[in-house]
UniProtKB/Swiss-Prot annotation:
Bilayer topology: Multi-pass membrane protein
Keyword Glycoprotein attributed: yes
Biological source species: Danio rerio (Zebrafish)
Name of the protein in its database record: Organic solute transporter subunit alpha
Keywords, comma-separated and alphabetical: Cell membrane, Endoplasmic reticulum, Glycoprotein, Lipid transport, Membrane, Transmembrane, Transmembrane helix, Transport
Amino acid sequence: METSNFTLFDPRCRAEAPFAIDAIKQLDIFGKVLYTVLTLMATASMLVFIEECIYIYKKVPAHKKSTIIWVTGVAPVMAIMSCLGMWVPRATMFTDMTSATYFAIVVFKFLILMIEEVGGDNAFLRRCEKQTFKISTGPCCCCCPCLPNVPITRRSLFILKLGSYQFALMKLVLTIFSIVLWTNGSFSLTNVSASGAAIWINSFIGVLTIIALWPVAIMFMHVREALRTLKIVPKYAMYQLVLILSQLQTAIINILALNGTIACSPPYSSQARGYMMSQQLLIVEMFIITLVTRVLYRRQYEPIPEPDDVEEKKTVLSSKKAIDVA
């Protein structure tokens, strides 16, 4: 009998992501323990966030409450969405879109937070009326040190806000548009050809993301010294870490899955398994970020001193030190 030279291929490796009940039935003891622990971590993240919201409503000035809640909620929301995507594999596209849309809003809210920490628009303009913005910063123009500084005016501040706000608005619009195309069968995350809608929409979102991150970086570079006592540097680091983990890490895993580097494991195809791994990693990472964020934002919210007050205090301390030496 002749034997043909071929490789057996499980047809389930080309199938869509499994239904939730099928994914649950194939779990072994380790899988059940893993899913339980990850679910508890996601739930704990949301409980910590709820407790933080209660603290913010009691202790934080009214004009800062909503902004801080939006910013501190990014990690718990991503943890919960990742948990839902882990349990319901076919809902991954929607949970990822929800997380990405929330983060787009947080990009704008973090810019507003830095301005509010200084005292709001009027206080910021009064404090920095003779200063300039350094626009030769990442992610757009970090390699262009020759760019001139821009005077700080109400108009330049509005342009910075608009640069971040457009991402929050357009991300929501494009998410709704993608869902409409998906219902018509015209949108698929696995179709990365030039004829597919996903590659064009995601590329456009990438450009909008870079444009939106630029104003936040410009504002951070300007206020980081004034807000150093308010832990603005680690807060900004957490914001950047969420960006890297939710966008870059997820994109790398998805690319590896599309290329077949991540092996198929029925009932999960390569792509579905890549999404599952991404969700599980994000739950752990967002849980840790939630705990760190709670420590950073749980403080007494008092106005920062004016520059004149700081200089006066330094002068008094210097005079007192000179008298003591004499």
